[in-house]
């Protein structure tokens, strides 16, 4: 009996070692929904996370991305914008900067249920991976959109604070900060240096799940 158990243990250990490890890009958090109920996450449990919504910009965005250092903010990307600037998208991919899908205003999805699927497919074509996170432009998530998100196994992420420049807000544990960069509403990306000097940013997963790790401010 002891000999059989020993052989089974050796066989199991060998099979485990032969299994390929999950890469960082396809971590366990990328294949499971964060919440069981259809709800938009607007706050975590620990630290601060920076998210930047991008639907406008050319050279300024490229220069800012080139200067970014880890840990990176999560970039919520509008697919119409992304398709116009493939070189910027290549840079984002090469630097392995976290990305997510930025949609239109929430009300639009009540009348056009195909829109989200179209945006999702275009995002996958651009980045080669399905986004874990989705945000509408106004952070409004209609019921039908929640259903589409659950079917696609994509999480709805709002924010606890939108920063449009000006005074630096006080730090709140678990905060998810959203910064706009649109044609009619945008923060000069270099202004984010002031925000980064006021707190230390973590990843979305770290803030939501309350894990800790090395933290580093964005470059000046």
Question: What name fits each language-model region?
Answer:
Residues 1-51, 56-67, 200-220:
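N-terminal pre-catalytic segment of deacetylase/amide-hydrolase enzymes
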Residues 61, 85, 116, 188-192:
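Aromatic/hydrophobic pocket-lining residues that form the small-molecule binding cavity
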Residues 171-210:
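Catalytic grooves of carbohydrate-active enzymes
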Residues 70-183:
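Metal-dependent polysaccharide deacetylase catalytic core of the NodB/CE4 family, i.e.
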Residues 31-34, 39, 49-52, 61, ...:
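Extended aliphatic helical segments
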Residues 67-68, 152, 194-195:
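Glycine-rich, phosphate-binding/catalytic loops in enzymes
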